[in-house]
């Protein structure tokens, strides 16, 4: 995998904090191609030969033998763990034991965490593989397959011979280069004593080994390729390369060969270490560090082919060598044996785990002897993690500790999500020290603390980032155990290749009982006594915090903070923009006077006017919360108003403003990921720059009467939002219902969008002069017509709308339609009588309205890493026909859905050729499908392009789960179908 010297494993340019300005020179070969290409048909993937050095018959014969042992690895790291993120990718491996079905590849392919995958042989047979070993430090690991599953290919294996790797040796790299089925790259070994390449911080790095260097120009996907000589012997393992040259780095196969022999003999693969990183430094540099001339002469005499010695680069605190070896010490011997190579150090340490050995080294010209106990490298390599409250944790690993010279201890956040999302930018690199003021030095202590925390509780957490251990951070987090119900321990099982899950707590402790709390508002100071009532309007504002656990309805934000307006303080109702409350599947917190917060509940979502109503318990708030007075007169262009709002810094600001225009418009759609947007709006625009810095506010008269809500409207991109006013008269009927403590359960609406036309445009398209005169006579502001801009795709139960794009609306139920507000009668009527102009002909239509009761998302299915739901209204608005009600809204970065090519914003129409019109029929089909079997899916893209793919289920890591919202209680109920 290309790492470009960066700290993030998925190829994104995300550098560690200490290396922001440092350009790295090395990369680790991508084990996936740079694009999400699928494997090409065999007719398009013939071997790519690089014959710059040789084209002998012997090479041709060797390559024919080698390719039968080389496999393409298609795999997934199904969970973030240690230095690795969850991802789907591809790489190369090769058979080293045909009888046992053993495949050698890179450690960064096998990964330290959960792995699933399969391999494809040269004849396109594919078999499942399981990981059986990954080295704690060096970049190699082994996968295993059942040889009985290979039916049409005679298995061959490559022999490992590290002794044949010599300078000048002509080699071939045979592998899955850049995602191709098979590429063969030529090169010549130029170095055999290179230090291990540095791939950056917070990612996997090899160390304490020599690397072999050659110029082969390998790219993504070639990780794990065998490097063979002319006789077909594997002399090295492809691992990485340079981003600025054609240089590649190969791992010597001496340690993989030893590990393979242990596996074949059924012996444990012992690994010893003293937590010291050594670097091979040339003799002149050793001399500058204090290596004496006499010692150099002796070393050159004993090792005439060597150019340097091993020097201590890093000694980890609290490790076996801490205080005994110091940085800059030059290693001379171990247990009486003189040392010149990393290989011999590995051999000695691996054979003496738990024993004390004598180390002799020079420090500033003095020879020093120390007895050091050899530690067990496997003991400081984590093999378990805990998943709770949406985040994952493991004990700090040797890999991470070495990057920043830390003791190998502590609780490491390997997936900072859910309740433990400390930063929007970084999800890796955090060490948690205390939770709820209790120390959590390791996983066991952390588990016991988390068991005692009730759901929905708020607790302080103390943490640091490994890149800056000087800085201590304290943050109050919200413990979410109702959306993120899983609290489990995962332990690696090298026999089965799986990670075994153990539930640590079936249900969280119930939330603590809430008690009423006091809060005090500070009124806005005004020198003008006529605005005394305006100063109290701060008591009508509340902060609204939203947590959305999933990507339902393609809403882009998991966490958001905005403000709302209390429209009924007696019953506890707040009006807020749907920019912050997009759907029912979220947690809401209402904060009063920046002092106390109480839980809120979404009780009403307006289908097109971009506002939501949330409810809180007013008995829990002992503060002077007030509802404003509401005007019953619509605003006009030119009206003078007073603005009170909250800016980007969440601070209240005020301004005198004037209504510059009132426009009929629709918010621009996002066709890549359709989501909720405001439509058929009659929006108020102002002549003030200050108001555009505020996402929430109110427009009032001098006496404090509220004339309009100032709201944020999410635009076509995540970064773009529009700020516009919504006239209070447009929501007055809903507000009056709330004041009667009645929540509207159902509105009706027209299933179409309308846009404004000038009189000239209307005249050109056939509007008669008599109608134009009627509009001119009744106009109070701009004279315009409304035309049908878009007609939404109907649901399966509904009939298509009789309206067509381009229809010019003259009247509805006999009333002229001068602006969007004239459609308001649709909320209570099952049908409306339209007078329209279509193709210059005047027509009368009966247009039915649609019921919005079931419009919002209330049923979600998680299947094979894909998130499925009924197409929400934002999807139907942009389509003319819905292929199916099984809509793929999102997918995980590591599940079967991603691995086998399911694309979000598409539809599943058939499963195993059985039609799946809706989620219920889909569940009925998939619940009968066994685990680890292939499923045929028929898909239709958002652009109505059909496709067929196959997908292999994996219920161990990706069980089928449904979430349904109870219409009465508003609670979401979870049910697991396949697990």
Curated annotation (Swiss-Prot):
Region Serine protease, residue ranges: 65-260
Matches recorded under Pfam families: PDZ_1, Trypsin_2
MF annotations from Gene Ontology: serine-type endopeptidase activity
E.C. designation(s): 3.4.21.-
Feature: compositional bias, Basic and acidic residues: 1-20
Keywords: Apoptosis, Hydrolase, Nucleus, Protease, Repeat, Serine protease
Gene Ontology BP terms: apoptotic process; cellular response to heat; lipid metabolic process; stress-induced homeostatically regulated protein degradation pathway
Residue ranges constituting the PDZ domain according to the UniProt record: 277-362, 871-943
Primary localization class, coarse: nucleus
Ranges that cross the membrane: none
Residues covered by region (Disordered): 1-43
Family the entry assigns: Belongs to the peptidase S1C family.
PANTHER family in the cross-refs: PRO-APOPTOTIC SERINE PROTEASE NMA111
Protein name: Pro-apoptotic serine protease NMA111
Native species: Lodderomyces elongisporus (strain ATCC 11503 / CBS 2605 / JCM 1781 / NBRC 1676 / NRRL YB-4239)
